[in-house]
């Protein structure tokens, strides 16, 4: 909403523009009226809308045309004043003033106009019969007011309507010609309805209506008031109320009624509470709240954010199969202006046999977005109405900023839940297969993935000492010389080589020696395609001898050419190394250590899924 309002009064000489301003300020008719009143500012605390208001007078005798044009450009609303007892001044409204104003303003952003019939004390009849056709002809005219500066009739109302025309304009909401709401308004209110429909049954029940009422107006509706609202809808349409709740059609009808009855402020209050600006676009302040991330820190969703996202999933998982079908996913994202997840997401997270994103995959994708692009995560949470449903100041309340990694190293412990593993290796060595295996896909399933749907990320959960952690794998394109800082910034590194290709290991050795030999980032050598015949590597040292020389863990055998889903043990090891980068190689080689780290991983995974299924049944 605007921080102030600038009102300009124009019209023919002697129609009473200056008298109107002076009567408002002094609350009495002036004995002497100057040719033009100085600009006055009404403080916010004495205006109904609590917004500072500047009132500007125009005098043809004292100002040039250029000065008039400048004032028209600066004005938020223009009052065209005519005298109800002067037919010529009424004619000038359409023959001179409206065309002049429209010439000086953009067609797509017309300044709202108020027609003001002054000197109503001098006539017994109304000018409305003459004015109404003009109002119907020009959609930029918000309203018409008849008043009298002499007896103070409708003076304060005039300036209130002028304020209202700026702060709660009709133009973006409603088409007088069509007598219906504009598409952009319907779209915004439909999103608001879907967010407020907490159980996604297409109806706002009494609890949801009361939550909506408290959210927008800070007061609940009494039971009788709720019934009165629904009765108004019932009397005007057959499908506005269903199962004693308000349907989308009924919700839209109510707002149409508010607008038609001059209660624009009601609809605008709702729109602004849900983040919309005067052009019915979500504001940048709403979508992207101020959020700073110190160096060497990462971003994660907190517990309340996960609970919210779980409720969104549950709301749209209609068949309760713990996965989102394409239709369910499309329905979930109807509150977005675009589809945020492409087909690559299905190859980034866990899916079921039908290729649908599972409950775990859904949470994983949100975790990935938060980690890699927190601003986009804030935007997405804004579309879902996080701050409104969770009653928070902004989406920033959903994000936890982890402490500096150097502090974690010093203290030899971390509170982080998301760890990044960059996967490097020569072209064709099996990096993509390594990522997809983490999602439970063997070689047969991987061959079904289209090249244009490929993802360079994979994220899922692992369990270390009974704690659920997210491991984010990122496949880095092969380029020894020009690896970027982003390619090197991670918690653990996987150097993958193809044991059947004699030239594959050389790339891993070069990357390690150039970029990681002197770093504190843990590294693991992965001997991929271990189901194939092992070829001797064309390098001065064998992979095993290379690892011994550089005090690395021996090469880890890996294959995704299995009948069942590939084992996740290796990924648990990677997560553990990322969590405990200070551990010595002797510790990491200790089989008892790995046993303790991975114990219960399968049990915890199964238990977590079973608990979610049980919760669904309870609901």
Curated annotation (Swiss-Prot):
GO molecular function (one): GTPase activity
EC number: 3.6.5.-
Protein's GO biological process: cellular homeostasis; mitochondrial outer membrane permeabilization; mitochondrion organization; mitochondrion transport along microtubule
Pfam short name (any one): EF_assoc_2
Record: residues binding GTP 2: 427, 429-433, 447, 529, 531, 559-560
Residues holding Mg(2+) 2: 427
Record topological domains on the Mitochondrial intermembrane side: 617-619
Protein's organism: Danio rerio (Zebrafish)
Protein name: Mitochondrial Rho GTPase 1-A
Membrane topology field: Single-pass type IV membrane protein
Catalytic activity: GTP + H2O = GDP + phosphate + H(+); ATP + H2O = ADP + phosphate + H(+); UTP + H2O = UDP + phosphate + H(+)
Enzyme class: hydrolase
Ranges where the Miro domain occurs: 2-168, 416-580
Binding of GTP 1, residues: 14, 16-19, 59, 118-119, 121, 149-150
Family as reported in the entry's similarity comment: Belongs to the mitochondrial Rho GTPase family.
Transmembrane segments: 594-616
Purpose of the protein: Atypical mitochondrial nucleoside-triphosphatase (NTPase) involved in mitochondrial trafficking. Probably involved in control of anterograde transport of mitochondria and their subcellular distribution. Can hydrolyze GTP, ATP and UTP.
Residue numbers binding Ca(2+) 1: 197, 199, 201, 208
Cellular component, GO annotation: mitochondrial outer membrane; mitochondrion
Residue ranges of every copy of the EF-hand domain listed in the record: 184-219, 304-339
InterPro entries from the UniProt entry: EF-hand-dom_pair, EF_Hand_1_Ca_BS, EF_hand_assoc_1, EF_hand_assoc_2, EF_hand_dom, Miro, Miro-EF-hand_domain, MIRO_dom
Family annotation (PANTHER family): EF-HAND CALCIUM-BINDING DOMAIN-CONTAINING PROTEIN 7
Keywords: Calcium, GTP-binding, Hydrolase, Magnesium, Membrane, Metal-binding, Mitochondrion, Mitochondrion outer membrane, Nucleotide-binding, Repeat, Transmembrane, Transmembrane helix
Compartments it resides in: Mitochondrion outer membrane
Major localization class: mitochondrion
